[in-house]
Design a protein with these regions (language model features):
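Structured, solvent-exposed hinge/loop segments at the ends of secondary-structure elements
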Residues: 26-139
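Short, solvent-exposed coil/turn segments
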Residues: 2, 40-42, 94-97, 126, ...
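Alpha-helical architecture
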Residues: 9, 13, 26, 103, ...
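Small/polar loops that bind or transfer phosphate-bearing groups
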Residues: 21, 100-101, 190, 217
Length: 240
């Protein structure tokens, strides 16, 4: 009888744990695809490109901007969404600071409508030595406008926190370094744009500038986010 009670209790505890884990996974998936990411994602398409010839990343941006259907273009080295940031550890004021890093085009904050809480942020005149931190990192580390990291890199702005990562860890220390090396491109289309024309134009542009690259899959950002977090949904189903 005692053994039976132990087995029943153990089964109950395991069941409760699985229910909690399933709920967390489902909440993360549901949030990322249905709730406000605190960015302007309307009419945004995304694609990635491999095997870009050195120095041609910005050429792709400039060529895409010639299409009448496309209102604006920005880019990043890794996907701006999902858990694709690199994690750096640096010393600041005698304290070890770990933070997530994205390398981005200077206009990415304007493109996604991410406001600066302080400072000018990044722009077309920014250099590779300029970077922006999020509000969470500012409050957590004391880094502020004008402070330097690794002697040369200077904080140019403090951005509003956004939900471009997993909910699992909530907001994290995030830094966005200005770069001219990209693999991910984001297009904002005009209202009523010819989507098929845009997709064909993207593919022909990539083929012309980066002939060794695979043909890109061009999709709307919301579909991209659903796909990124598809594994989370699968885990939810498997665990449940």
């Amino acid at each position: 009888r005692v053994l039976r009670s132990i087995l029943v209790s153990t089964q109950f505890v395991v069941s409760m744990i699985l229910m909690i884990v399933t709920s967390v996974f489902f909440m993360q998936y549901r949030y990322m695809i249905n709730y406000d990411l605190e960015i302007d994602e309307d009419n945004v398409m995304v694609f990635s490109v491999d095997n870009i010839p050195e120095g041609k990343e910005e050429t792709i941006v400039q060529e895409l901007q010639t299409n009448a259907n496309i209102a604006d273009v920005t880019a990043s080295m890794t996907s701006f969404f999902g858990e694709n940031a690199s994690v750096n550890v640096r010393d600041f004021n005698g304290k070890s600071v770990d933070f997530n890093v994205w390398y981005v085009r200077g206009n990415i904050f304007d493109f996604f409508g991410i406001p600066m809480i302080d400072g000018d942020g990044l722009n077309a005149n920014s250099t590779r030595w300029d970077f922006v931190i999020n509000s969470y990192m500012n409050q957590n580390t004391g880094l502020n406008i004008g402070d330097k990291m690794d002697t040369y890199y200077t904080v140019k702005g403090i951005s509003q926190d956004i939900h471009n990562m997993s909910l699992r860890n909530g907001h994290v220390n995030s830094a966005y370094y200005c770069s001219d090396s990209f693999n991910w491109y984001y297009l904002r289309l005009h209202e009523g744009a010819d989507v098929k024309d845009v997709i064909n134009f993207v593919k022909s542009t990539v083929n012309e500038i980066a002939p060794l690259a695979d043909e890109p899959d061009v999709e709307f950002l919301n579909e991209n986010i659903k796909r990124i977090y598809g594994d989370v949904k699968k885990q939810t189903i498997l665990i449940g």
